[in-house]
């Protein structure tokens, strides 16, 4: 596989996402709203633990205020109270299902915008980046977005339900294997044996969920581009993988690498801000810097996600492109 063959779809996906930056911001706002909604039952459960069980709130929430760690801490504290634990888990389940459904519906509108941009942008990836080309690829509009949400809503909800079920089954299998490994190793080999088992299972889980999320994105792209059912989208995705295996795997490898680099940069930035917080007076600037880092991190991950979607879309629904001789304002090739 030649490098340009892989460069062009990735560049096209990046330019389509950049030209339609409002949907990137919209996806970020939707995800942030979902996380805020998810924090409500967790914070409520924390105060329930603090009041009913007389436990320290900071110990339950954890030092890093991570939602997953906080939810685990609350659930652990409520183990001795089945009714309270059931209510807490039910509240989280309601928020997860409702918030996820909201995200699934919005994703239909977002991909409808990207598909429309794909079909009107022309071969913009073959030319230097110009503002005129980005304007031509910008297809963000309320009508296109709402039409996409209405047209794809039912199918995206069905596909999303399958995704949530996959997450649930994968999580239960992970916990089962880790607990079984802990019991099999025993106290003598706890430090080494159980740690190795847990690390291996965690790595396998991350790899598996990465493949699941990639397949989920490709199915969404196919459904948005061809307006087909979930089953037909799965057939089309498999056909695309057989026909264009090298570039599909190449796009997957590049996008996963970019996400990994962005995650590493985020961790380093967070650690750096943590060190700054100990400096007198200078530490006062940490909060706005943390908010800025959170904003940039969220926008970057949403942008990478839509870049990946645009790259897969360019492989599946190749642009017809305007004639090379055609041009737009400023002498830029169309």
Residue map of PLM features:
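Hydrophobic alpha-helical membrane segments
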Residues: 1-334
